[in-house]
Amino acid sequence: MKLFGFGSRRGQTAQGSIDHVYTGSGYRIRDSELQKIHRAAVKGDAAEVERCLARRSGDLDALDKQHRTALHLACASGHVQVVTLLVNRKCQIDVCDKENRTPLIQAVHCQEEACAVILLEHGANPNLKDIYGNTALHYAVYSESTSLAEKLLSHGAHIEALDKDNNTPLLFAIICKKEKMVEFLLKRKASSHAVDRLRRSALMLAVYYDSPGIVNILLKQNIDVFAQDMCGRDAEDYAISHHLTKIQQQILEHKKKILKKEKSDVGSSDESAVSIFHELRVDSLPASDDKDLNVATKQCVPEKVSEPLPGSSHEKGNRIVNGQGEGPPAKHPSLKPSTEVEDPAVKGAVQRKNVQTLRAEQALPVASEEEQERHERSEKKQPQVKEGNNTNKSEKIQLSENICDSTSSAAAGRLTQQRKIGKTYPQQFPKKLKEEHDRCTLKQENEEKTNVNMLYKKNREELERKEKQYKKEVEAKQLEPTVQSLEMKSKTARNTPNRDFHNHEEMKGLMDENCILKADIAILRQEICTMKNDNLEKENKYLKDIKIVKETNAALEKYIKLNEEMITETAFRYQQELNDLKAENTRLNAELLKEKESKKRLEADIESYQSRLAAAISKHSESVKTERNLKLALERTRDVSVQVEMSSAISKVKDENEFLTEQLSETQIKFNALKDKFRKTRDSLRKKSLALETVQNDLSQTQQQTQEMKEMYQNAEAKVNNSTGKWNCVEERICHLQRENAWLVQQLDDVHQKEDHKEIVTNIQRGFIESGKKDLVLEEKSKKLMNECDHLKESLFQYEREKTEGVVSIKEDKYFQTSRKKI
């Protein structure tokens, strides 16, 4: 997702997150998500779009699965004809997709300027925002299209629109390092004083993202260089923390120009204030001011100060008050003060004080005896003066050390705060780079600490060196009074007559000098008090800033801990879900193996049933053939017997009767044998029919799953029942014929016993022949029934095979559906 945080050094990871949102050539289009009108809009087929609208006018604003209309897809693909067609049909122009992007935003995102112009001319709103809070102008800034931005602004786009990170298009152009767009937006009067969520100004962001060209443009626009963010850091602090010396020099030069302008404006008022102090007289100050000067200065100066002290003027004032102001100190390149007084009023007072001391030295008369005594007293007081100077200088050295310590600690604290606030804020880095970023921040903090320690050591060495130089200077000043006393003695010897005149002039010069010094002392005291108040205010401000930074650090640490806990919880939850899925996968695999085994077993059972059925059918056909052959043989034997009987003579009736009785007995035996075989075959058929019924019952249990095949099965079963009924009728008729045959046999027996005439025999034979014909008719009917039974069995077998295939396919479909639902 989009994160406009500034987490990496000069915005590298933030730039990557921005690119993730703003780059891309359009939508990811899947054909399954689109309707016909959407496919035509993607292809740019205006004729097909018009046909779709003619068929169904409701497709004009139809949405796909990603909530995109045909206008969205046409704008993303840059098809101007389709866009004009849809707009002329008065479709919804400001409809939003799943990312809350309008067709105008999508056209600007894909840099389709012609489509964007058509939408703007037909009243598209350029100030609508997507889910990231970006307007069409933000996307135009990213693509660095000034023409698109110009058209958006001319159609009412808000130039100060804010995204989710409170970035205006100008700030966003600075983040993306789009120098051309920065110049364009500033020409269109975009506000250069806008700030983001962390209250960072445009200049701070330009420094942060290492854009010296943009910094130069902003400085030309007279941007506020002294503006501060939430943590109290300005643009120069950003340049120092990121080691950007070039940008730091640009900012310093701009600050110097601003200070020069302010000094030129304030100079006249400072000179008037100094002239008022020069008009002060000697009586306006108490006599104890000169004695208490050092004490007052010591009390006014705080122990730790962060502002520079007026060191040069303070030293000169001490020398003059302590009696060492007879001559100016020798200038040395190594003795330059480390801090300079920026106030022009104080500089003017110090310069005028030095001029007065020089004049007093030039106007000194030749010393008389009183002057010699005074010099002797001053020589006696010289060790005390030396001790005072030494104490003052040692205090100055300690004070400068405290200043160095405070500045170094403040710098280190500021850098660590900058690292903490600027680097651990949750929007600064992506979650994947968090550990690497923490390591980098620790390394940078350690480097900054080492740099601060090195600076402290260097400053300490410089202070020690300056202390030695001050000691040498004090020794030289101690020798100056002795030399001057000798010179004064020689001058007194030469100029004794003019002693009174020179004494009067000397007193007058000293009085004037005293007035000037008192005025300078008052100025310095007031300045010291103001500096003290400023330092106290700054200390309070720094303490408040430190508290705020500590609170923010604590909040950020809590946020980091919460994030870590959430990450661990989500990882644990995902691990549990993964384990559950693995277990379910193993269970499903086991079920699949069981299903495969059961399927194989059922297939084997079906094959065995098929083989058994085929064997039973073949046995049944063989038995029918044997029965048919037996019947034919019986008919042949009957025909032969009839022919023999007809050809035999009447005289041989007894022999023929005996022969017939023998034949009848033989045929009866054969008939009985055939009857037994018929019974056996019938029993076997019954068994096989029972087996078929069991198979049909098994099949009926499986057929309950499919409702459509049930009717066919019932019809087939009804036909089988009819055939079995017919078969039972045939059996009953066969039994009836057997009974008739038995009755005929009994009649033959009676004939043999009674020895009746041939007519009875012929009648019996005729009845036997008729019964044979009836048997043939019954056999034909039984053949037809057997054929019907075979046809029904074949249809049943085919039906069972189709049914098993359908059941297997249904089971497989159900299994895959259940497995998909579980997954």
From Swiss-Prot:
One Pfam family recorded for the sequence: CCDC144C
Region (Disordered): 301-343, 355-402
PANTHER family the UniProt entry points to: ANKYRIN REPEAT DOMAIN 36-RELATED, ANKYRIN REPEAT DOMAIN-CONTAINING PROTEIN 20A1-RELATED
Matching Gene3D superfamilies: Ankyrin repeat-containing domain
SUPFAM superfamilies: Ankyrin repeat (SSF48403)
Name of encoding gene: ANKRD20A2P
Protein name: Putative ankyrin repeat domain-containing protein 20A2
Coiled-coil blocks: 431-480, 565-724, 776-805
The keyword Repeat is annotated on this UniProt entry: yes
S-S pairs: none
Originating organism: Homo sapiens (Human)
Renumbered ranges of ANK repeats: 66-95, 99-128, 132-161, 165-194, 198-227
Keywords: ANK repeat, Coiled coil, Repeat
Top-level taxon of the source organism: Eukaryota
Stretches with biased composition (Basic and acidic residues): 372-384
Keyword presence, Transit peptide: no
